[in-house]
């Protein structure tokens, strides 16, 4: 079995074409806002879940080639999201022993910064300096952040609402299964 990520014009013109060619399950999660790069979660048998990068403008691959990992660590990394300015990427990792939300500069270099010690599905507000994520208790959480030069600083995570989200199916990881999204004005959430 070969797993691929496909790209096609949004208006439906033209054929879909593969931009990856992998023997491992792939789950695309985010486009970079200005570069021609897509972050993809790859479920690799040797390294588990990793965020890898694909370039959709390249020609369709005809051989199975490894995709470059974003971090290349032994920890699981998944469900990446590029910041609206494209200078940061948030993702989930179990580097600290449980699923937490990390942010690092894109394309790097830079040290990953833990912004939430427990959570998943990071999603940037398109209108405010806020990073949303789902807490392990199914509450939508948010951190306010600021960037100073090449430093990313964030406040402590806080609940965005007291309402709880519908739980994900047990074991449902490694796909962009966000149960919420942020309105372009940054004032509303759908979920």
PLM features: what roles do these ranges have?
Residues 134-137, 142-152, 156-157, 182-191:
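Hydrophobic alpha-helical membrane-insertion signals
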Residues 2, 35, 48-50, 64-67, ...:
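A structure-centric signal for secondary-structure junctions around beta-strands
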Residues 1-6, 20-25, 41-53, 72-78, ...:
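A flexible loop/linker signature enriched in serine peptidases of the S9 family
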Residues 8-25, 54-78, 103-120, 126, ...:
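Multi-bladed beta-propeller domains
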């Amino acid at each position: 079995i070969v797993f691929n990520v496909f790209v096609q014009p949004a208006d439906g013109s033209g054929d879909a074409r593969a931009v990856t060619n992998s023997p491992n399950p792939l789950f695309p999660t985010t486009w970079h806002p200005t570069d021609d790069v897509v972050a993809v979660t790859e479920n690799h048998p040797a390294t588990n879940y990793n965020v890898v990068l694909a370039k959709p403008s390249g020609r369709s691959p005809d051989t199975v080639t490894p995709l470059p990992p974003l971090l290349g660590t032994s920890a699981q990394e998944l469900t990446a999201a590029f910041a609206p300015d494209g200078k940061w990427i948030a993702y989930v990792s179990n580097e600290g022993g449980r699923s937490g939300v990390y942010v690092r500069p894109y394309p790097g270099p830079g040290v990953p910064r833990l912004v939430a010690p427990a959570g998943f599905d990071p999603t940037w507000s398109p209108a405010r300096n806020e990073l949303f994520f789902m807490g392990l208790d199914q509450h939508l959480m948010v951190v306010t952040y600021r960037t100073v030069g090449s430093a990313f600083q964030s406040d402590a995570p806080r609940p965005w609402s007291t309402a709880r989200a519908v739980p994900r199916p047990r074991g449902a990881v490694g796909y962009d299964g966000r149960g919420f999204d942020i309105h372009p004005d940054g004032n509303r959430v759908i979920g």
